[in-house]
């Protein structure tokens, strides 16, 4: 099994898992009228489950027009999903803090601006050129903002896990809910790690689609994230 094939399998698994989990969460939000479920559902269904795989497939489409159209749609979906993620952090973990919503809004602006930069790079790249190389700077900025959001969610998940663990010892919390905060924190840390590796590769001038280290990091990170998603939102019945 070649590294490229392993990467494709892992990322496909992550995308499918994200789409299924995200769709279920959005459906649940329609029934419960819950904003958090809707926001995180959009994150997974729109960005991870649809936008990201579309951006991977786009360069292989037949014809420049089809490729550009797919890349534009993919970037819009990714920006929307990642912005929803930022506001999920604000609304769920810091609902009463005066700074959380402005920080989420700032993150969304960075996502939108860098997303536009990626689109502009693809539109201006000459035919036959590696447009991804032209979008290197904008992609790095986008990933920096994403890693910041993922660091935020990882720290909040682990902070709430510690709080719930103390309450669990007093019989005031549920063990399953407590464990899910731990899984959420671990999932965030995994995402920070694999995106951090990609950022380092981008800044070093490496081809992140072909270099073994970022490809392996993305593959294993995607696989681990898929497992955490299932255990957090669709745990098996033992």
What kind of region is each of these model predictions?
Residues 29-33, 62, 93-97, 126, ...:
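Membrane-interfacial segments
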Residues 121-125, 170-175, 234-238:
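General structural signal for secondary-structure boundaries
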Residues 153-157, 180-238:
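C-terminal transmembrane-bundle signature of multipass membrane proteins
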Residues 24-52, 100-109, 139-201:
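Alpha-helical transmembrane segments of multi-pass integral membrane proteins
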Residues 123-133:
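Interfacial non-cytosolic loop connecting adjacent transmembrane helices
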Residues 2-22, 33-121, 136-147, 210-224:
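Individual alpha-helical transmembrane segments in multi-pass integral membrane proteins
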């Amino acid at each position: 099994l070649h590294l490229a094939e392993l990467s494709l399998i892992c990322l496909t698994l992550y995308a499918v898992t994200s789409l299924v989990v995200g769709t279920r969460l959005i459906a649940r939000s329609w029934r419960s009228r819950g904003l958090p479920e809707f926001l995180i559902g959009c994150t997974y269904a729109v960005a991870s489950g649809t936008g990201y795989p579309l951006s991977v497939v786009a360069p292989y489409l037949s014809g420049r027009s089809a490729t550009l159209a797919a890349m534009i749609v993919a970037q819009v979906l990714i920006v929307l999903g990642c912005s929803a993620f930022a506001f999920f952090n604000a609304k769920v973990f810091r609902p009463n803090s005066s700074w959380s919503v402005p920080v989420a809004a700032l993150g969304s602006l960075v996502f939108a601006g860098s997303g536009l930069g990626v689109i502009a790079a693809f539109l201006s790249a000459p035919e036959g050129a590696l447009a991804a190389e032209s979008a290197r700077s904008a992609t790095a900025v986008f990933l920096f903002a994403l890693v910041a959001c993922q660091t935020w969610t990882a720290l909040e998940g682990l902070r709430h896990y510690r709080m719930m663990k103390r309450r669990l010892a007093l019989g005031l919390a549920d063990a399953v809910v407590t464990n899910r905060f731990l899984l959420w924190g671990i999932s965030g840390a995994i995402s920070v790690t694999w995106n951090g590796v990609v950022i380092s590769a981008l800044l070093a001038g490496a081809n992140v689609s072909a270099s073994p280290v970022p490809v392996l990091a993305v593959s294993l990170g995607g696989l681990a994230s898929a497992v955490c998603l299932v255990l957090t939102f669709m745990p098996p019945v033992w």
